[in-house]
Every structure is written in C-alpha cells, then in structure tokens.
Amino acid sequence: MPKWFGGAALGSGLGLPPSDQWKAQWARVKRWRVKAERIRAKSMREELDASDLDEVVAYLQNCYHLRDWVEASRPELKALLDALFQKHFELGACRDVCNGFKHKAVKRPSHDPDFNLYREYDHFLEDGAPGRNPVLIAFADGVNLRKFDLFEFTDTCFALWTDFIAREVEAPARG
C-alpha cells in the first residue's frame, strides 16, 4: 500500500481529530522553515536568486495559512487569533506577503499592499559581498516605513506562532 502524505484539507483523511488538524499545517510550516534557514545560510556565502526568494515566500505563505488551519480546527480561538494579528505588525505583514504574492492586487491589506522585497547595498563594501548586503522587506506603516531583515522577519513570525501555539492552542483547556 502506498504511503499517504495528506491531501484532504480538513476532512477525515488527515487521521487526526478535527480539533488537532491544525498540526498538519504546523508541521508543514516547520518543514518550510528548515528550507528558509538553508536559504539564510546560503545568503552568507553567495548571492540569492529568485528561486531562493520563492522558497522564503512559500515559507511565509504557509506561516500565514496556519491561521486558517488553527481557526478551522479550533473555532473558539478566533478572537485570540484576531488579537494576535492585531497586536503584532509582523503577522499582519506576513498576511500581506502571502496575499501579495498570490494576487495581482491586494484589496484589503493588513498594512501595505505594495510592500517591497529588496537588497540594500553598502557601496563601501565589496559589491555583492554575501552576508553583508542583506535582503530586506519593507512595509508602509502610516506615514512611516518599517524595514526588516528578511530572515529576522521570518524568525519573528515563527517565534510568535511558537509562543501562541504553546500558550493558547496546546495549553490545557481552560475551565
């Protein structure tokens, strides 16, 4: 019999009780994070190409989609998920990245439908010196511009999810 890897979004094919089906997406996020970490390591040695950035974007897309999985598996957490995304700029920005790479025009952004992913160069360093000219991601925040190192941004999103899952999703039921 062939090994089953998944495919039934939230159906019985996951082999998990409905309230635990978010775990399939969390495991996927962790696998994509490993790929993003490999890209980070590569960025210290050599210039990244478009396919490298595609992998980091795919990680962020899976990171945002975790929200849907948690909400569908544990509807009672919707208000806490809303509060999490309202409190942390980075998670709203993660949503914008997810939707911005999926749709040509983002109609209801969390922050900035026209965010930018770019490389910032220090002209006093060797041109293209790996690890010294970071890939940044920038979002408009009102009249201000918020810039993040791309890999620090991915770290923050992962840390926020890790904390939320430990504190709210996996925590014992409140009585």
PLM region spans:
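Amphipathic, well-ordered alpha-helical segments in soluble domains
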Residues: W32-K35, N62-W69
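Acidic, Ser/Thr/Gly/Pro-rich intrinsically disordered interaction regions
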Residues: M1-V57, P75-G175
